[in-house]
Amino acid sequence: MSGTSATLADLVRRPSVNPMGRDLSGPEYLEARVTDYLVQRFTAAGIPWARQSVAPGRDNVVARLEATVPDAPVILWDAHQDTVPAEGMTIEPFSPLVRDGRMYGRGACDVKGGMAAMLVAL
């Protein structure tokens, strides 16, 4: 698996379901697992980061790379960590499945795929 695909699989394996007003009755809820993964990746890459507490188990992570070229334009990359609930999925939502060159799993296209691309690009 390539760097981006492996990173995406790592993210899909980390449930981060937004409860959307529902009772927190399962271990798949909230974004803490993805937050911890992002912190680990940024730390390993030597990228400064900060947590922003929103609610218990629902921290944001902000990382910042300084420009290496004077007066370079600012680029902002943004991705949310939460996914919609997994009810109704016909595959195991948190076990990445590659079929016909595509990865399936909760959040693979919204927005963990984009997040994986950003992480690998760093």
Please provide the spans of the model-predicted regions.
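Acidic/His- and Gly-rich active-site-bordering loop/insert found
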Residues: 1-108
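Acidic/histidine-rich catalytic neighborhood of metal-dependent amide-processing enzymes
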Residues: 103, 111-122
